[in-house]
């Protein structure tokens, strides 16, 4: 009985082996395809609406300059920079004070480099257009204008937006003349123009070690950093 069972198993094994050799055992055929979207995808990115260059340009007018910052923050920081060429025949005015010198700033207005960069610092903190856009040199009404006019407008915009000066730090860069004898007068006048306590207005002066136009007494520059606080 055992021999008969063994023969049956061997016979079955041989039959199975011959079937594999002659005709491989295959799984039911299944179609495997690559997924493709019904519609072709475009790799180009198209905005929902076309925006022309003109629409992104800032149209500087009263409605723009009087607009309050869209986001109310407890503090706002601004930076201003300005540079003017020094030429004979012009007065040198810094912070609204006439400084004795053999040359002054060649500019469309009175060329007060300090007040100009302070204005830009305030406007920058408020997120508004710069001084050149609000008071363009292409407008004849600003020719020879006192820069105190620009400061007053910047202060008005700051007040309208609900901010006041936390502190201001300015640096003058010029080779000549020496600013130290005039520094306190300039700082005091700047504080008055800003309506700020003198303790929050700081002024420094640096030479340019006789390097480039600043060091050669051919130009004057100024930097200002300002912190505005919500009233």
Curated annotation (Swiss-Prot):
The record places the transit peptide at 1-52
Per the entry, which co-factors are needed? a divalent metal cation
**Could you mention a single GO BP entry for this protein?**
isopentenyl diphosphate biosynthetic process, methylerythritol 4-phosphate pathway
- Catalytic activity, as annotated: 4-CDP-2-C-methyl-D-erythritol 2-phosphate = 2-C-methyl-D-erythritol 2,4-cyclic diphosphate + CMP
For this UniProt record, the keywords arranged alphabetically read as follows: Chloroplast, Isoprene biosynthesis, Lyase, Metal-binding, Plastid, Transit peptide
What pathway is this protein a component of? Isoprenoid biosynthesis; isopentenyl diphosphate biosynthesis via DXP pathway; isopentenyl diphosphate from 1-deoxy-D-xylulose 5-phosphate: step 4/6
Q: Which parts of the sequence are marked as the site Transition state stabilizer?
A: 108, 207
**Induction of its expression:** Circadian-regulated with a peak in the late period of dark phase and early period of the light phase.
- Highest taxon listed in the record's lineage: Eukaryota
- SUPFAM superfamilies linked to this entry: IpsF-like (SSF69765)
Q: Where does a divalent metal cation bind?
A: 82, 84, 116
Gene disruption: observed consequences: Albino phenotype and seedling lethal when homozygous. The phenotype is caused by an early arrest in chloroplast differentiation.
Q: Which residues bind substrate?
A: 82-84, 108-109, 112-120, 130-132, 135-139, 174-180, 205-209
The catalytic activity of this protein is classed by the Enzyme Commission as 4.6.1.12
Q: Which HAMAP family match?
A: IspF
NCBIfam families reported for this sequence: ispF
Assembly and oligomerization: Homotrimer.
Function recorded in the entry = Enzyme of the plastid non-mevalonate pathway for isoprenoid biosynthesis that converts 4-diphosphocytidyl-2C-methyl-D-erythritol 2-phosphate into 2C-methyl-D-erythritol 2,4-cyclodiphosphate and CMP. Is essential for chloroplast development.
Which PANTHER family does the record associate with it?
A: 2-C-METHYL-D-ERYTHRITOL 2,4-CYCLODIPHOSPHATE SYNTHASE, CHLOROPLASTIC
Q: Which family does it belong to?
A: Belongs to the IspF family.
Q: By what name is this protein known?
A: 2-C-methyl-D-erythritol 2,4-cyclodiphosphate synthase, chloroplastic
Record organism: Arabidopsis thaliana
């Amino acid at each position: 009985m055992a021999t008969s069972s063994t023969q049956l198993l061997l016979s079955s094994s041989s039959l199975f082996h011959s079937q594999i050799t002659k005709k491989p055992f295959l799984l039911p055929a299944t179609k495997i395809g690559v997924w493709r979207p019904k519609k072709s995808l475009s790799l180009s990115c198209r905005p929902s609406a076309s925006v022309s260059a003109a629409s992104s340009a800032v149209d500087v007018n009263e409605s723009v300059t009087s607009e309050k910052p869209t986001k109310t923050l407890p503090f706002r920081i601004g930076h201003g920079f300005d540079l003017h060429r020094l030429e004979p025949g012009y007065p040198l005015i810094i912070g609204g004070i006439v400084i004795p010198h053999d040359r002054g700033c060649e500019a469309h207005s009175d060329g007060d480099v300090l007040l100009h960069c302070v204005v830009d610092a305030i406007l920058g903190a408020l997120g508004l257009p710069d001084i050149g856009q609000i008071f363009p040199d292409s407008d004849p009404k600003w020719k020879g204008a006192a820069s105190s006019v620009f400061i007053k407008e910047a202060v008005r915009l700051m007040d309208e937006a609900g901010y006041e000066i936390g502190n201001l730090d300015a640096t003058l860069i010029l080779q000549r003349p020496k600013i130290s004898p005039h520094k306190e007068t300039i700082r005091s006048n700047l504080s008055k123009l800003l309506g700020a306590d003198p303790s929050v207005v700081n002024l420094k002066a640096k030479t340019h070690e006789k390097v480039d136009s600043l060091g050669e007494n051919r130009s004057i520059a100024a930097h200002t950093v300002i912190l505005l606080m919500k009233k």
